[in-house]
Amino acid sequence: MTKQEVTYEAKGQILIIHLPKELDHHSSRNLKYETDLLFAENYINKVIFDFSKTEFMDSSGVGILLNRYKQMARSGGKVNLYGANRQVNSILMMGGIMKLMEHYDTKEEAVFR
């Protein structure tokens, strides 16, 4: 996996998005395009963002997270996240993400709650 590559894992109606090392303008643009396609082709009622490999995130990353949250909220879905390090956690808090999404330490917690 390159530093900008996002990977996806589907578990029924749950989409787990494994974020790259850097969630910046470039990777956020790709993430938006790819998730738009996945949402159009599949019924998804929960999105989980995996931050375990993410070391850097800018405002574009915050923007795409907010966009995906709003999209899921409109359809009655849920968004969780897990694995954020201290630096990314700080950005998520400043961006208001932590007030909107449930955050967990592990993938298992994020999937089953």
Give the positions of each predicted feature.
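Amphipathic alpha-helical interaction surfaces in cytosolic regulatory modules
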Residues: 25-100
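Short acidic-hydrophobic, aromatic-tinged amphipathic segments that line or gate anion-handling sites
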Residues: 102-106
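Short, flexible active-site-adjacent loop segments at beta-strand->alpha-helix junctions, enriched
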Residues: 21, 85, 107
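STAS-typified acidic loop motif
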Residues: 4-33, 51
